[in-house]
Amino acid sequence: MTIGILPEYALLEMFGFYVDEAQAVEEAQTEDDTQAVDNARDIEKWHTLVHVCRQWRYVVFASPRRLKLRLLCTDRRPVREMLCIWPATLPIVIWSNHRPISLMDGVDNIIAALEHPDRVCRIDLRSVPSSLLERLADLMQRPFPALEYLELRTENEAAPDVSDSFLGGPAPHLRSLLLKTVPFPALQKLLLSASHLVRLNLWNIPHTLYTTPEAMIACLSSLPKLETLRLGFRSPRPHLNLTNGPLPQPRTELPFLTSLRFLGDSEYLEDLVAWITAPLLNTVKITFFDQPVFEISHLPRFISRAEKLNALNQIDLMFDSRSVAATLSPQSGEANCPRLRLEISSTESDWQLSSLVQVCRQSLPTLSTLKRLDIREGQYPRPRWQDNNEEDAHWLVLLQLFTAVEDLHLSKRLALHVAPALQDLAEERAAVVLPALQNVFIERLPPTGIIRRAIKQFAAARQRLDRPITIKRRKRE
């Protein structure tokens, strides 16, 4: 049998599988800037099919919904000519190539596509100059009834406000919204009308658009289908006073939320998660701005209400010149496994250690279940370590949190600081710090030197307490 004698329904099923696979890749790449070009190409997979033969072309255009046909309009294409060639029923995707200069040169093509608001299903414009953002926003002061995906990004922190009449009011079919550095005062009004929203990403939020936790919770309560939430503030907000307003009763449940990303002050997050339940939460990444004192009580309760985040049994502590982070995950290491990451923006090593102790102690309900502890440096240059008794004390306070850890993995650089801190422990304290420890793995452990002497002295103290440990050399991962 040759493919030419297949019935049309069989061809349609084959084409549907082909396009569905492309769409799955597209959705997976939605949040990844580096994949933007491939993402756009995936939208046009159907072009290959219609150019094979007349029969295939007929099958494709006879089933535009089943095959999710869309017309890709960019700043570098003659959009007006394209609109005359292809069927007028095809939904329009507006996409920029993410280069501001090219986008300015090709703005007429973007405008030509925006002139068909009833057909536009997706708008993806990144690195938009502020002057162009204002112009495009003015062109979008009308309803876009088919719009499902909207992404606007500008790098200009002085970008003008987007008008309250943006999109002409409600956006009932909107499924994904990403705004980066885009000042949109009427955002709350838009969110309250977008009940089908699945992904919400508000990043680099300026102080002029500050939304109280109470108002944000009210918006989230109107988004029952939300799966991904990302909130990122531009900088710490001075003189925080977030708890005076009335909070909602009862707690808002987000039954489909699986991913949460937050960048901001701990006080804001506390007031937010105190009134949210997300039982299917699978991935959490939280970055706190540097602050002297962390007062966290609602976050661990929020985490404990997510079943998948209560089965994490290993923790990775990463230090670099910009931040310190603690990442919890299962030891299985499977793809798409549950993951909880807490990060603190801090540069000084002693401050990193003391902040990490505060956040881990207050935020992590599963400390007593962790079996593996990794301590390593990050991709940026290491922080400025002090190498003094005060820093040793900080290390010991941190390690004392992990009462169930059996395996300790140290990178070579961090072993230079952790091992000396363990070296001079009195025997009674050697039983308190990492009491369940059985194995120490040190990256490229030399046969002699500071690290070897320090860790051997700690091992001897544990041996006298009848709590022996094994020292092993670990290859660099």
Predicted regions and their residues:
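Leucine-rich repeat
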Residues: 1-477
